[in-house]
């Protein structure tokens, strides 16, 4: 089965330029209609707010999203990169089915508060960038391996000393993966899945080879000893550098 999920929130101009974030009810409705038209479908299974708009009460945004459910245009609602208080307020307005937030070996922040909260409320967790934007696959052994026009050039974890420190961690993951005769990325995905049945990783790729590797990670099982070894390599907050150069748009 295919679950069709899409987001709204990043407003763009006709030329594709970024115009900021909007959670205004009228934008929620117009964005949904535009997505339905582009996708050629009569409903969206899971509709996310891409980023919380700090200038619009979450009750107003989710209220408009709830109207889409009532109209049959959307089946379930989701949030992305929302903080605990926002999640509670949103869920009180209309049941939230999924929270999409970055989570991987090198981004373990959700373990602090979010996991206990969403499990209390019965919200599923969708882990984006479970491969650390490709870094955990071992694809980048040198800073020069990153294409010049790639957005990762300006991401803190991929720059300078941070790159080198994080690379040393990944090399240890590569060694563990080699012992299991799997790819580093498969080990990283298996670790995410091992954190709970309510966690769904969504790795992205542009290559069929990597897609097949990611799918095959479903069959990778990690023992308690292996999980301990991985935790010892990548404990909370060991990663050098922030996730983004500007962290103001997350955990709101």
Give the predicted meaning of each segment.
Residues 1-12:
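A short, structured active-site edge motif that brings together acidic residues
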Residues 4, 35, 44, 57, ...:
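Conserved, mostly hydrophobic/aromatic
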Residues 8-10, 83, 103-107, 129-136, ...:
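Glycine-rich beta-alpha junction loops
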Residues 11-109, 113:
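Glycine/proline-rich, positively charged
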Residues 21-23, 93-97, 115-119, 142-146, ...:
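Short, hinge-like loop/turn segments at secondary-structure boundaries
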Residues 73, 91-98, 119-126, 197-199:
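Glycine-enriched alpha-helix->loop->beta-strand junction motifs that scaffold or abut catalytic
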Residues 120, 148-179, 194-199, 212-252:
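Terminal-tail/helix-coil boundary detector
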